């Protein structure tokens, strides 16, 4: 049998991954998302590795909004958008996201992975170029692979290399600079002001995946374009509803009106995927309403992140510099990252060791993510646990 060969090869691969400390085990939760969660086996732990930046994953207002919408609009749409899958609430959310992000128009997707996967191929042909930061999210990388445009990469946040790439692609019809707004593994922000200056100088478009920023970065949570004051200079923003904005799933692309209209006509993930579920649409609309009322949650996550980062640096941990809710503790060796995460779980702190291929080889880390749901007591407990395990492992 043909599968016999594949089976033995895969079993050998899994054995190698386990020996190298690269095999990923999924921990099973027994509670809803929150600052404190239950883990199968009866253990409770503080959760410091969720994308739950605003603490809205289990918020009663958000849950009720999802239930109310579902009671009227139903569980699913059973269709794609252009057949019979566009409800009034989908247009409401598109309009609300356009207003929130300061863009002309918005198109919804089942996930931001689909938003990125469906952007480049319809927009850029063989006579165009896409210029990408080397640490961009996998969804950008995969989306770029689907298009026929010339591909250029620049070293992470290196503006000199970006300018070289712009010069090299001067004869291309269109040039699109694409970058994460907040880089998910390092927690630093793209230099959007400098990127926009270069884009203006060389007549290029700018695209930002703001998934790890929308909702809490910027004065009112509008993301990295707001933080850098360049919203009107950004051509395309992709983002998710699966992180700060409630944490379920779904995403969108916002941007120039004509680009969004092209995506409605040609973007394959949009044309051939079911419409976003009504419950997610309703919950996301509620989140946007809540954010328009108050900056309290945004201010809280910033306060928590600043305090945690300061205390961990003071304790002697190797922290990647940054000023977002993502705080990477660098451990470099994959087995060490996995071991430390397991030891912290025994102390009541849920974190994950990130290893290759999620991060480059030799760059293993524990990525701590702060939330508005965390209390000062939660932070102090977790800092104390890190210090204890850090001393036991000889890290501090």
Regions found by a protein language model. Name each.
Residues 11-73, 204:
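N-terminal "arm"/small-domain region of PLP-dependent enzymes with the aminotransferase-like
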Residues 52, 152-208:
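Active-site phosphate-binding strand-loop segment of PLP-dependent enzymes
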Residues 60, 64-68, 72, 95, ...:
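PLP-dependent enzyme catalytic core of the Aspartate aminotransferase-like
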Residues 80-86, 94-118:
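Short loop-beta-helix segment that forms the pyridoxal 5′-phosphate
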Residues 119-138:
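Conserved PLP-anchoring active-site segment centered on the Schiff-base-forming lysine
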Residues 220, 226-262:
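Active-site PLP attachment segment
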Residues 245-312, 317-320:
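PLP-dependent aminotransferase class I/II
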Residues 299-308, 313-348, 358, 362-363, ...:
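Conserved PLP-binding catalytic core of the aspartate aminotransferase-like
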């Amino acid at each position: 049998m043909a599968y016999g060969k594949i089976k033995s090869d895969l079993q050998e691969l899994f054995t190698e991954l386990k020996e190298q400390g690269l095999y990923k085990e999924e921990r099973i939760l027994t509670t809803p998302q929150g600052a404190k969660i239950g883990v199968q086996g009866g253990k409770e732990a503080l959760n410091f590795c969720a994308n739950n930046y605003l603490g809205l994953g289990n918020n009663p207002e958000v849950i009720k909004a999802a239930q109310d919408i579902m009671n009227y609009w139903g569980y699913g749409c059973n269709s794609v958008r252009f057949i019979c899958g566009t409800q009034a609430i989908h247009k409401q959310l598109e309009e609300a996201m356009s207003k929130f992000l300061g863009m002309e128009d918005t198109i919804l997707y089942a996930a931001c992975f689909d938003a990125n996967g469906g952007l480049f191929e319809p927009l850029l042909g063989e006579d165009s170029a896409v210029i990408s930061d080397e640490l961009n999210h996998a969804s950008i990388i995969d989306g770029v692979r689907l298009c026929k445009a010339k591909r250029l990469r620049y070293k992470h946040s290196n503006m000199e290399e970006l300018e070289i790439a712009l010069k090299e692609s001067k004869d291309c019809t269109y040039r699109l600079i694409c970058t994460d707004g907040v880089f998910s593994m390092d927690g630093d922000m793209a230099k959007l002001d400098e990127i926009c200056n270069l884009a203006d100088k060389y007549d290029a478009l700018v695209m930002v995946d703001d998934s790890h920023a929308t909702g809490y970065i910027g004065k009112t949570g509008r993301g990295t374009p707001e933080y850098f004051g360049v919203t009107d200079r950004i051509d395309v923003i992709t983002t998710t509803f699966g992180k700060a904005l409630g944490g379920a799933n779904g995403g969108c692309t916002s941007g120039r009106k004509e680009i969004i209209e092209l995506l409605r006509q040609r973007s394959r993930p949009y044309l051939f995927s079911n419409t976003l579920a009504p419950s997610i649409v309703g919950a996301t609309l509620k989140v946007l309403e809540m954010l328009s009322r108050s900056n309290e949650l945004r201010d809280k996550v910033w306060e928590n992140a600043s305090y945690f980062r300061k205390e961990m640096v003071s304790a002697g941990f190797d922290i990647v510099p940054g000023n977002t809710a993502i705080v990477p503790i660098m451990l470099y060796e994959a087995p060490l990252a996995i071991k430390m995460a397991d030891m912290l779980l025994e102390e009541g702190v849920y974190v994950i060791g990130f290893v290759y291929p999620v991060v480059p080889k030799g760059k293993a880390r524990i990525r701590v993510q702060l939330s508005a749901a965390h209390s000062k007591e939660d932070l102090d407990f977790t800092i104390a646990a890190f210090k204890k395990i850090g001393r036991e492992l000889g890290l501090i």
